[in-house]
Amino acid sequence: MGRFIFLSFGLLVVFLSLSGTGADCPSGWSSYEGHCYNIFHLFKTWAEAERFCRKQVKGAHLVSIESSEEADFVAQLVSENMKRYGIYIWIGLRVRGKKKQCSSQWSDGSSVSYQNWIEAESKTCLGLQKETEFRKWFNIYCGERNPFVCEA
């Protein structure tokens, strides 16, 4: 009887410890701070990638990076999974308007509170650059086709 109680308690502890991890993410997606992330090795324009993300999971968009900790998580995830693909990865931020100002919102509607530019240029979409280990934001022509990260 004592062994049964010990085993039951052990299973309960394991279940409770897993309930706050990736259990809520779809299969193949990675979990971080209550959000789910997936890298797609498909080469799409920024707009195509955003549309693709929206079709994957309810509430999904191109990734919005809102802290240095999240930037580190995304960089590690991309580095581990993009060893032989392109040099840029789309993120959910683009420049809008006649003055080419950076939008104050990510494609998911959240405010831009963290920035990590490598340099500012006249190109209107943003991605992570391989040369910076996918940690810095780089301006890229929106019609270029690149892999991307979706976040839900």
UniProtKB/Swiss-Prot annotation:
Heterodimer of subunits A and B; disulfide-linked. One of its GO terms (cellular component) is extracellular region. It comes from Gloydius halys (Chinese water mocassin). Residues 1-23 form the signal peptide. This is Snaclec coagulation factor IX/factor X-binding protein subunit A. It is found in: Secreted. Ca(2+) binds at residues 64, 66, 70, 151. Coiled coil: none annotated. GO terms for molecular function: metal ion binding; toxin activity. Expressed by the venom gland. Calcium is required for ligand binding. The keyword Metal-binding applies. Residues 32-151 form the C-type lectin domain. Anticoagulant protein which binds to the gamma-carboxyglutamic acid-domain regions of factors IX (F9) and factor X (F10) in the presence of calcium with a 1 to 1 stoichiometry. Keywords: Blood coagulation cascade inhibiting toxin, Calcium, Disulfide bond, Hemostasis impairing toxin, Metal-binding, Secreted, Signal, Toxin. Belongs to the snaclec family. Disulfide bonds join 25-36, 53-150, 125-142.
